Amino acid sequence: MTARQPSSRSCFVCGRENQAGLRARWESDRRAGEVRAEIAIPERFNGYPGVVHGGVVTALLDEAMARTALVEGGFEDLMVTARMEVAFRQPVPTATPVTVVARLRRKTGSRAQAEAELRLPDGSV
């Protein structure tokens, strides 16, 4: 069963009122232990023509991983990023529906480790 996650109005990634942002809608799946969003990233976020800027891809992955803490807990479990490593495997096309998926790997006190991936329509990462 999935549930829509709340968003912050002005957040660059999820803010519904941030006209300059991505306005991603996030859902939690408690059974799968995942957070996911489906989004077609507009061309204004190009790095090169037709390709999403790597910083925007990284922002989506960062947001997804931070939101994994909300699957079991609440806003008191919000996390901030201390360290993040991204491996870019292929370009992400703009204006194409993609799925961002994140899972919490481990949580100990105020520290957590999560992983995320961005899937293209053909299922590739």
How should these model regions be labeled?
Residues R36-E63, V71:
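A conserved, well-ordered hydrophobic junction motif at loop->secondary-structure transitions
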Residues R23, T81-R83, Q113:
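Hydrophobic residues on conserved beta-strands that form the core of alpha/beta folds
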Residues M1-R44:
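Non-catalytic linker/capping segments at the edges of enzyme domains
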Residues M1-R4, V92-T94, R103-V125:
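HotDog/MaoC-like acyl-thioester-processing domains
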Residues Q19-A20, M79, G109-R111:
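Short solvent-exposed loop/turn micro-motifs enriched in small/polar/acidic residues
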